[in-house]
């Protein structure tokens, strides 16, 4: 996955469009779509927040129907969450507008909105923009990846080619309000692989748990979190095991990109847990470490304060044998049932890099899990103190 971002194109049968419709005050691109020339099998996961946005609610209803998809339309700048029945109508109208232009059914179009909560969509701008979006359809992926951003500092793309030539291209957005429970976080994958929808949907929750649900920036779960994969089958039959492994790799790549681009972040925080009683406990312990303000602050200051790892693991709910527990910082053992002698200054120096890794062995089993976060800087507070003002 080393191809320069500008050169990434969508898999065969998919095209995308992006434009500045005037939703964002900045005038940057804020309305986009991805369209398939063929029906798509799809899998979806949305936020478990009880204040889920209109787009999540509608997508969930469409997902339950089992019907195929043809398109996705996204607006950035307004979340259209906590907007009542008017917000629900506006969301449906956005889908219907694109469906009409594409001559497909409204139920074949899913929607996504991201931005400020509690604001209605400027529907005159949205509908006017959607009407012209298909005129801009192209194969390049970067314009779409850029148009879905809000506080992100960079676009996020990942891609892979399978042995039969089928491709998976994934794109995501997210920088703050990141603590998914399926923070504003979107992740979409598009593939020309032919995969059975039932098998895809059956495997998807576990993949999401190990990737996007293992990311945290600030502990706040968004009203609009969602991830979806669309498969149009244009490349023909594909080995399911190979496909699912590749899909998880793309989603893992995107998850790490989201964590690294956390609001105000200067370092990616990776916590790798082993020796857990179950994968769920391993993931829970790793994620609790990544969301700890104390550990995040230590990472920002390059402080190898491993006691904050012990604290976070202890409150995670994971089973632990302290006498068998081990902790390493940047590969240096610092705890093994008790404190170890180590060169704190050298470890601190090693933490002054793009990624800081903590390895934690819980000492109770053989399960493992990994989570990603970022450091906590003064810039995070500045960004969010001034977000709407």
UniProtKB/Swiss-Prot annotation:
User: What keywords is this UniProt entry annotated with?
Assistant: Acyltransferase, Amino-acid biosynthesis, Arginine biosynthesis, Autocatalytic cleavage, Cytoplasm, Multifunctional enzyme, Transferase
Q: Where is this site: Cleavage?
A: 183-184
Q: Does the keyword Amino-acid biosynthesis apply?
A: yes
Which residues of this protein are catalytic? Answer: 184 (nucleophile)
Q: Can you list the GO cellular component terms from the UniProt entry?
A: cytoplasm
Q: Which GO terms describe its biological process?
A: L-arginine biosynthetic process; ornithine biosynthetic process
Q: What is its EC number?
A: 2.3.1.35, 2.3.1.1
Query: Where in or outside the cell is it found?
Result: Cytoplasm
The role this protein plays is:
Catalyzes two activities which are involved in the cyclic version of arginine biosynthesis: the synthesis of N-acetylglutamate from glutamate and acetyl-CoA as the acetyl donor, and of ornithine by transacetylation between N(2)-acetylornithine and glutamate.
Q: Share what the entry says about its subunit structure, partners included.
A: Heterotetramer of two alpha and two beta chains.
What's the protein called, per UniProt?
Arginine biosynthesis bifunctional protein ArgJ
Provenance organism: Deinococcus radiodurans (strain ATCC 13939 / DSM 20539 / JCM 16871 / CCUG 27074 / LMG 4051 / NBRC 15346 / NCIMB 9279 / VKM B-1422 / R1)
Give me the gene this protein comes from: argJ
């Amino acid at each position: 996955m080393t191809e320069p971002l500008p050169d990434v194109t969508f898999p065969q049968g998919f095209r995308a469009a992006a434009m500045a419709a005037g939703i964002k005050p900045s005038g940057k691109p804020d309305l986009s779509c991805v369209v398939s020339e063929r029906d798509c099998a799809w899998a979806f996961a949305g936020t478990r927040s009880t204040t889920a946005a209109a787009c999540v609610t509608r997508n969930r209803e469409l997902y339950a129907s089992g019907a195929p998809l043809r398109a996705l339309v996204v607006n950035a700048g307004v979340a259209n969450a906590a907007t009542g029945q008017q917000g629900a109508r506006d969301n449906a109208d956005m889908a219907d507008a694109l469906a009409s232009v594409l001559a497909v059914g409204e139920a074949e179009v899913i929607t996504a909105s991201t931005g400020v909560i509690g604001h209605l969509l400027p529907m005159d701008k949205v509908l006017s923009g959607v009407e012209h979006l298909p005129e801009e359809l192209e194969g390049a992926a970067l314009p779409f990846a850029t148009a879905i951003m809000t506080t992100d500092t960079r676009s996020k793309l990942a891609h892979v080619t399978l042995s039969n030539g089928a491709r998976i291209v994934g794109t995501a957005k997210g920088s703050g309000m990141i603590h998914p429970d399926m923070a504003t976080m979107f992740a979409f994958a598009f593939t020309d692989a032919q995969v059975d929808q039932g098998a895809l949907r059956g495997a998807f929750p576990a993949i999401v748990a190990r990737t996007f649900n293992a990311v945290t920036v600030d502990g706040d779960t968004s009203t609009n979190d969602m991830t979806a994969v669309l498969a149009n089958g244009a490349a023909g039959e594909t080995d399911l095991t190979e496909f699912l492994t590749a899909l998880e790799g793309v989603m893992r790549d995107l998850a790490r990109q989201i964590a690294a681009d956390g609001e105000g972040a200067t370092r990616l925080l990776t916590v790798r847990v082993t020796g857990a009683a179950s994968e769920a406990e391993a993931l829970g312990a790793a994620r609790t470490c990544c969301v700890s303000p104390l550990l995040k602050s230590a990472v920002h200051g390059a402080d190898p304060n491993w006691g904050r790892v012990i604290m976070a693991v202890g409150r995670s709910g994971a089973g632990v044998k302290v006498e068998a527990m081990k902790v390493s910082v940047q590969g240096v053992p610092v705890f093994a049932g008790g404190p170890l002698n180590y060169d704190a200054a050298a470890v601190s120096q090693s933490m002054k890099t793009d990624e800081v890794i903590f390895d934690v062995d819980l000492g109770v089993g053989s399960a493992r899990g990994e989570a990603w976060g970022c450091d906590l800087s003064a810039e995070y507070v500045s960004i969010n103190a001034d977000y709407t003002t």
